Amino acid sequence: MLLGYGKVRTFVKLQIKMIMKKSIKRLPKRTQEELTVLLDLVRKSIGNCQMVILFGSYARGNYVLWDSNIEFGVHTSYQSDYDILVVVTGQIKYVERKLHRITNQYHDLFAGRRHAFPQFVVEHINTVNRNLEVSQYFFTDIVKEGVMLYNSGKHELAKPRKLS
């Protein structure tokens, strides 16, 4: 208990559970459509896909749909990309080649309109879990802020160890 301003205040230590979000409904409809197409392409092409997780600015909600500027007479533009972790069993190199083809298919499908670019990170489930068990920042951040777009249900993500 702490005393302050004449009142007794009790502070309770809360344990924050890392529960990954599972819905993209808060994102714009157009973004939902693009992510759904990407997810369908990934699931159809990669048989050993165990999980697909959106992370980064779109998962956090601080994405930029489109921004353009003219500075010193030069036109520049920016938009956030889709950061997507694809968790697999089996060979990663094989999956990376397929994701390159998927990216090209996706760009062909949305060629007539401005669309976000996907950036894929591919990791084996064992690598992801080993890194979570030692609380590696990149992976714990993905679990904390990410959105689970697909889960085969065959594997679970490890619980990050508490850092002291």
Model regions and ranges:
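Catalytic core of pol beta-like nucleotidyltransferases
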Residues: 2-53, 58-78, 88-164
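Short, aliphatic-rich beta-strand segments
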Residues: 83-87
